[in-house]
């Protein structure tokens, strides 16, 4: 009650203080108005006094004096009113100060008497405990027409609390046996296995280590006996972790995944695999599929690959020209080097065959093949050339230089694929091209060292970007231009037809006075057993200038 009275007194003090502040503000406004009137009358009195000095008649002078006296009287009244209002304002300010002081005192008393929220909650609890002595049954007894068998929900809950706590009356909906291995050093628990059990057959054997009303955990030793020694209760976090591990173990799929398998070689990923992959038993079939993907008939190609593996491994000069580069792992490089030899034979154009025939008839220490072997391969090429001519418009290939002989087979192989744009056979374009009469003019410039002599072997230097393209550099280069015989792209494979302005390589060497004279068959094989660079450069030039070579 004291707190309520203090609150009322405080509110009254605040109200009085507010009224006094309003009166003070009104009186100050009135003082401002009185001061304005006072200034106006003073100015008027001075003006009349100044006019009075210039008037000579007596009547006017008397009237001016009376008016001046009235103004002086009003000025005095206004001055007194201003002084009175200022005094009243001072009194009101003092009263306001007094009220503020009383308000502060009341506020201090109120704070000392006022209860906090905790005190209020505590008092409410105490009052509730005091009034709880009244029975619930007595409350419901006052309700008319209530059946005697009715039991309130509160009473039913209180009566059933003891029954619900009984373990025997609770039925398990789901049971699971989890085998857990605990590390005594780190204290971590690992789930080894989890087996669901029928809820009807479950018997709560062992020691209860956890129970939150929804889940119960019993500890049982490995021999299905209760382990009383060293068994402690489990924390909720540990129980949740065990359940999570058990659920993850059950959700794991036994399916084993492997790398994607592509039937079409052109659908394989461009990123090379880092892991070593061993060739499977179906390698011959894969080779057959890859060869068929180029649009050529390769019956008998697998037989040639199998028979030539021992001879061609490490020494064979291979050419691969797929539609795009296909990466291979290191373990597949040897097989990949052997496969494209047949593909290059299928992709050889008719006007390129005469140059290749010279190389096939001559035994080469690099290829390791006998002349009879070369003849067999040539006959196989001739038998397979018609389907190549049929699909010549659709097949696109590139010329790739041979691998160096001293390259380690275990190292990765980098291949360069050079593409050329197809030139359409238009009469207008032929007119624009100066000197074009339907014949390809292939010119080869060979830098040779004639002063050093023939005994010094040529050393191959490799291009920094393409290690498979060889450029032969002698120790001291002396440029001597040589021109290769002109070749018609439509030349037949069985015979050569000479053209005008075509000079053979032998005639060029004789005209230039070269000390070295070779037959057309010997020129193409160097002294060290490697392929003559003129043949390789001529192939590149012909592929670059040909109409149907892309």
Swiss-Prot record:
One of its GO terms (cellular component) is cytoplasm. It is found in: Cytoplasm; Cell projection, Dendrite; Cell projection, Dendritic spine. The modification N-acetylmethionine is found at residue 1. The modification Phosphoserine is found at residues 135, 321, 370, 384-385, 497, 514, 519. Residues 248-280, 356-393, 463-528 are annotated as: Disordered. The modification Phosphothreonine is found at residue 271. Keywords: Acetylation, Cell projection, Coiled coil, Cytoplasm, Isopeptide bond, Phosphoprotein, Synapse, Ubl conjugation. Its main location: cytoplasm. Residues 248-259, 483-494 have a biased composition (Basic and acidic residues). There is a cross-link at residues 125, 179 (Glycyl lysine isopeptide (Lys-Gly) (interchain with G-Cter in SUMO2)). One of its GO terms (biological process) is regulation of cell shape. It holds the Pfam family Paralemmin. There is a cross-link at residue 179 (Glycyl lysine isopeptide (Lys-Gly) (interchain with G-Cter in SUMO1)). Residues 2-106 form a coiled coil. Phosphorylated. Belongs to the paralemmin family. Interacts with GLUL. PANTHER family: PALMDELPHIN. This is Palmdelphin. It comes from Bos taurus (Bovine).
């Amino acid at each position: 009650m004291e707190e309520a009275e203090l609150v009322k007194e405080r509110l009254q003090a605040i109200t009085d203080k507010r009224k006094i502040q309003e009166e003070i503000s009104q009186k100050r406004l009135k003082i401002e108005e009185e001061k304005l009137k006072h200034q106006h009358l003073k100015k008027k009195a001075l003006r009349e006094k100044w006019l009075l000095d210039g008037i000579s008649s007596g009547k006017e002078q008397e009237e001016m004096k009376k008016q001046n006296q009235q103004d002086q009287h009003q000025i005095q009244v206004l001055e007194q009113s201003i002084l009175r209002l200022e005094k009243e304002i001072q009194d009101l300010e003092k009263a306001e100060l007094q009220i503020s002081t009383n308000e502060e005192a009341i506020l201090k008393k109120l704070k000392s008497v006022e209860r906090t929220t905790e005190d209020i909650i505590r008092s409410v609890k105490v009052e509730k405990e005091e009034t709880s002595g009244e029975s619930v049954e007595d409350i419901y007894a006052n309700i008319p027409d209530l059946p005697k068998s009715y039991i309130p929900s509160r009473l039913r809950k209180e009566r059933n609390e003891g029954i619900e706590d009984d373990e025997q009356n609770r039925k398990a909906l789901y049971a699971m046996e989890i085998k857990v291995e605990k590390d005594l050093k780190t204290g971590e628990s690992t789930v080894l296995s989890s087996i669901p059990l029928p809820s009807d057959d479950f018997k709560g054997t062992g020691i209860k280590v956890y129970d939150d009303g929804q889940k119960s955990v019993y500890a049982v030793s490995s021999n299905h006996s209760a382990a009383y020694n060293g068994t402690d209760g489990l924390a909720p976090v540990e129980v949740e972790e065990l359940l999570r591990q058990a659920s993850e173990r059950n959700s794991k799929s036994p399916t084993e995944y492997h790398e994607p398998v592509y039937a079409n070689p052109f659908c394989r990923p461009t990123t090379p695999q880092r892991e070593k992959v061993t060739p499977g038993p179906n390698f011959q079939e894969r080779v057959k599929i890859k060869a068929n993907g180029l649009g050529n008939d390769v019956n008998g190609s697998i037989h040639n690959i199998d028979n030539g593996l021992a001879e061609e491994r490490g020494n064979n000069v291979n050419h691969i020209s797929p539609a795009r580069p296909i990466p291979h792992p290191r373990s597949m490089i040897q097989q990949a080097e052997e496969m494209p030899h047949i593909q290059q034979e299928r992709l050889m154009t008719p006007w390129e065959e005469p140059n290749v025939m010279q190389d096939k008839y001559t035994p080469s220490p690099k290829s390791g093949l006998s002349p009879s072997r070369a003849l067999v391969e040539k006959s196989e090429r001739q038998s397979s050339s018609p389907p190549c001519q049929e699909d010549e418009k659709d097949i696109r290939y590139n010329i790739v230089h041979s691998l160096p002989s001293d390259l380690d087979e275990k190292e990765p192989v980098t291949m360069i694929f050079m593409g050329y744009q197809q030139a359409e056979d238009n009469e207008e374009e032929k007119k624009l091209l100066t000197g074009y009469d339907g014949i390809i003019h292939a010119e080869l410039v060979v830098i040779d060292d004639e002063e050093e002599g023939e005994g010094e072997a040529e050393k191959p230097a490799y291009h920094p970007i393409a290690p498979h393209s060889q450029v032969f550099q002698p120790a001291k280069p002396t440029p001597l231009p040589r021109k290769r015989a002109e070749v018609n792209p439509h030349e037949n494979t069985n015979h050569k037809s000479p053209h005008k302005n075509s000079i053979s390589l032998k005639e060029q060497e004789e005209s230039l006075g070269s000390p070295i004279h070779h037959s057309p068959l010997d020129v193409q094989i160097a002294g060290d057993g490697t392929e003559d660079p003129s043949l390789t450069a001529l192939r590149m030039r012909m592929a670059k200038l040909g109409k149907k070579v892309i």
